[in-house]
Curated annotation (Swiss-Prot):
PROSITE patterns: RIBOSOMAL_L1. Part of the 50S ribosomal subunit. Cross-links to the P and E site tRNAs. Gene3D superfamilies: 3.30.190.20, 3.40.50.790. One of the primary rRNA binding proteins, it binds very close to the 3'-end of the 23S rRNA. Forms part of the L1 stalk. It is often not seen in high-resolution crystal structures, but can be seen in cryo_EM and 3D reconstruction models. These indicate that the distal end of the stalk moves by approximately 20 angstroms. This stalk movement is thought to be coupled to movement of deacylated tRNA into and out of the E site, and thus to participate in tRNA translocation. Contacts the P and E site tRNAs. Protein L1 is also a translational repressor protein, it controls the translation of the L11 operon by binding to its mRNA. One of its GO terms (cellular component) is cytosol. GO terms for biological process: cytoplasmic translation; negative regulation of translational initiation; ribosomal large subunit assembly. Coiled coil: none annotated. This is Large ribosomal subunit protein uL1. Keywords: Repressor, Ribonucleoprotein, Ribosomal protein, RNA-binding, rRNA-binding, Translation regulation, tRNA-binding. Pfam families: Ribosomal_L1. The keyword Cell membrane does not apply. InterPro entries: Ribosom_uL1_bac-type, Ribosomal_uL1, Ribosomal_uL1-like, Ribosomal_uL1/biogenesis, Ribosomal_uL1_3-a/b-sand, Ribosomal_uL1_CS.
Length: 234
């Protein structure tokens, strides 16, 4: 059996794996246990009451968190003409068509989000094998294929998170950094859960949001009692 590190021993002593914590208590616990030498992200796992094997019950989308994620995001946009100028004005680092595709084919991937106008998908379509495995392929369901590329760039820069359930029906994403004020982390979590509720598949039966856990990059998950969240979530 692997020997527990001192950090993991402390976490095991502090975190009761059988308990659902009030959100404020959960955040305080994460902050106390975040001892890494960098500012850890606060991640969330949401167990949904869906059958992930059925395509009509899969949940996918995007939402802008009110306080952002604390990350600086580099955006690449496939578009042309007036849209290209609008994308640059909105803060996109890379804008182009075939020239941008050529850079990507060469392995130049200095960006975190890819956005495309519908007319550019003929170019982006060639890059599926490169962008797809990295989760970067533009998709209208998450607002990254859109005629309004400037707004999409602004959303990405403002702290938009994209979400998609895994094969077990769990959503994994981030809600900020551990040095955020507790209120901001709480409001970001609530905004995400409201977005997930709006995205509930009509075919999903029973309890939809079954479990919510938050953790830091290097820490253990802490289950959150949903009763302590705002009425808009419950």
């Amino acid at each position: 059996m692997a020997k527990l590190t001192k950090r993991m021993r402390v976490i095991r002593e502090k975190v009761d794996a059988t308990k659902q914590y009030d959100i404020n208590e959960a955040i305080a616990l994460l902050k106390e246990l975040a001892t890494a030498k960098f500012v850890e992200s606060v991640d969330v796992a949401v167990n949904l009451g869906i059958d992930a094997r059925k395509s009509d019950q899969n949940v996918r989308g995007a939402t802008v968190l009110p306080h952002g994620t604390g990350r600086s995001v580099r955006v690449a946009v496939f578009t042309q003409g007036a849209n290209a100028e609008a994308a640059k004005a909105a803060g996109a680092e890379l804008v182009g068509m075939e020239d941008l595709a050529d850079q990507i084919k060469k392995g130049e991937m200095n960006f975190d989000v890819v956005i495309a106008s519908p007319d550019a998908m003929r170019v982006v379509g060639q890059l599926g094998q490169v962008l797809g495995p990295r989760g970067l392929m533009p998709n209208p369901k998450v607002g990254t294929v859109t005629p309004n590329v400037a707004e999409a760039v602004k959303n990405a820069k403002a702290g938009q998170v994209r979400y998609r359930n895994d094969k077990n029906g769990i959503i994994h994403t981030t809600i900020g950094k551990v040095d955020f004020d507790a209120d901001k982390l709480k409001e970001n979590l609530e905004a995400l859960l409201v977005a997930l509720k709006k995205a509930k598949p009509t075919q999903a039966k029973g309890v939809y949001i079954k479990k919510v856990s938050i953790s830091t990059t290097m820490g253990a998950g802490v289950a959150v009692d949903q009763a302590g969240l705002s009425a808009s979530v419950n």
